[in-house]
């Protein structure tokens, strides 16, 4: 049993069907939706601010999802919300565990889980696409190191600040006085407080995430036989930008050591390779990311 006890959520529901019942219209669905509600920060500011903005109760979401998956239904939407709750509560550790759980869920229950196949393949697909969007947004504001201000979103802000300063007649110093120091130099100073080992550890944690996503997608395409593509494209792109950003603050020799080699799916060559049957390894191999790098926001600004 792992730390988050996700293995117990994969045991069959006691009753006539291992997948339990359809709970789409069960009150627990609405209860989880309500617990996930989180008003944006701007709603607590300004003249028309909401006095008590809603804040998501992720512990409640996690508990409700666990009880439901264990005792009532093997539901894909509930599973996606569960992954989201672990991520929100435990950051990268929770995300790793959640993605591992989702891969096993799809492997074991895809043929019988809810929503049923009769509702159409696009219904299930949409649940995964929405999770992709939610995870991508979370990662953009996820602290890359212990400092909560060191995020991909803050890096974007620093690049925008530099661009604005280059166009401002008043110059960077005046901009800092009026808006605060959001410069690239200030961002680099914040990262500079951490040693190479810490940055390298974080780099590797983020670099491991695509492998977890590969497993989910390989199980999905193994069952659906759809044309292979990246379901979690947004999450992958955000992870790529994060690892590229972290690598900027590592010496070249450490970057070379941390470089992620291309996926190998030969039997026994990887942990994942040992767990997938031969036919499914072909699906896993097809998910190997291209070596062509997409244009980042920084490159676009430079041009």
Predicted ranges, named:
Residues 60-68:
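Amphipathic alpha-helices of TPR/Sel1-like and other helical repeat/solenoid scaffolds
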Residues 68-69, 116:
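Flexible helix-coil transition and linker loops at the boundaries of alpha-helical arrays
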Residues 70-77:
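Structural motif
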């Amino acid at each position: 049993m792992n730390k988050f006890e996700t293995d117990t959520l994969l045991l069959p529901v006691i009753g006539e069907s291992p997948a339990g019942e359809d709970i789409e219209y069960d009150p627990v669905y609405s209860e989880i939706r309500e617990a996930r509600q989180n008003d944006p920060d701007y709603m607590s500011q300004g003249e028309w601010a909401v006095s008590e903005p809603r804040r998501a109760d992720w512990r409640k979401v996690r508990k409700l999802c666990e009880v439901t998956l264990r005792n009532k239904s093997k539901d894909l939407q509930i599973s996606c919300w569960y992954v989201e709750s672990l991520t929100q509560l435990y950051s990268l550790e929770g995300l790793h565990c959640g993605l591992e759980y989702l891969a096993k869920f799809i492997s074991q229950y895809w043929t019988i889980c809810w929503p049923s196949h009769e509702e159409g393949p696009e219904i299930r697909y949409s649940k995964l696409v929405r999770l992709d969007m939610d995870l991508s947004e979370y990662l953009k504001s996820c602290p890359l190191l212990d400092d909560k201000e060191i995020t991909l979103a803050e890096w974007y802000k620093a690049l925008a600040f530099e661009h604005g300063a280059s166009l401002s007649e008043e110059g960077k110093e005046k901009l800092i006085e009026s808006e605060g120091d959001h410069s690239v130099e200030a961002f680099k100073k914040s990262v500079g407080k951490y040693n190479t080992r810490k940055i390298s550890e974080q780099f590797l944690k983020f670099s491991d995430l695509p492998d977890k996503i590969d497993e989910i997608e390989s199980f999905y395409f193994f069952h659906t036989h759809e044309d292979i593509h990246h379901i979690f494209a947004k999450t992958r792109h955000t992870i790529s930008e994060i690892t590229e950003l972290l690598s900027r603050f590592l010496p070249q020799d450490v970057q070379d050591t941390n470089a992620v080699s291309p996926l190998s799916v030969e039997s026994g060559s990887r942990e994942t390779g040992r767990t997938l049957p031969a036919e499914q390894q072909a699906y896993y191999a097809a998910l190997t990311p291209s070596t062509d790098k997409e244009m980042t926001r920084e490159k676009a600004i430079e041009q």
